[in-house]
Amino acid sequence: MVRQRLNSSPRKLAFASALAASFLLTGCDGEDSGSAPIVIDGPSITTGEGAFATSQSTARFLTQATFGPMPAQVSSLTGTSASSWCAQQRAREPTLVEPDFDAYLALAEEEGEESELMFAAPSYVFWKQAINAPDQLRLRMAFALSQILVVSDAGGEILSDVPESMVGYQDILRNHAFGNYRDLLEAITYNPAMGEWLTYMGNQKAEETGRVPDENYARELLLLFTVGIVELQPNGEPRLQNGQ
């Protein structure tokens, strides 16, 4: 599974958000659009109906929107509508982690309870599906979201000892990849993996004895998942007043 958090600078987080959002904008809105490509100050993102105009632009767009195109895909899509391709991708049934994970788990149980395969299965499934799954846009979108709404199985704690927890979390990202961000936030909030990762599992309210609730998740929700602490311009740079 994904174990690395993006550099948390405002510019890097803004680009990660732009990467996730770009698939739902001009080139991937499911409709033909004549609007100009969106301009982002940073690594460029191909959008608009010109995305499939040439073999080079097709390969570039698919490299951004999938885990990498095959030459046959580039040839067949060049000259067609990028919006139509995105609409077809969004209409595909989600490829979920759980079914393939269960298959690996069955093999692991044959080898014994402590089989290394059991703990490595989420990573095996991720790469297998990244290469072979037909709903590439959904998987790439879920991957972008996983770099923002981070949960990790690194560190030898519960999330690595119980690999099913990471499987369920990844499937939430895939099921909500093209949905409403508010709904996605609610889904991950009630997910045990996020509760364990950001330490609010079993959290209790404050009381007169001096007990205070763990506010780690509330802080992360505001600072990293939503509004942040600094108002940003569209290019990810801080919005200043009088140059400060």
Feature annotation, model-predicted:
Residues 24-27:
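C-terminal motif of bacterial Sec signal peptides marking the signal peptidase cleavage site
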Residues 31-124, 128-132, 136, 230, ...:
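N-terminal module-boundary/linker segments of secreted carbohydrate-active enzymes
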Residues 72-74, 78, 114-244:
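Primarily short, surface-exposed interaction patches in extracytoplasmic proteins
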Residues 15-21:
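Hydrophobic helical h-region of N-terminal Sec-dependent signal peptides
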Residues 2-15:
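Bacterial N-terminal signal peptides that target proteins for export
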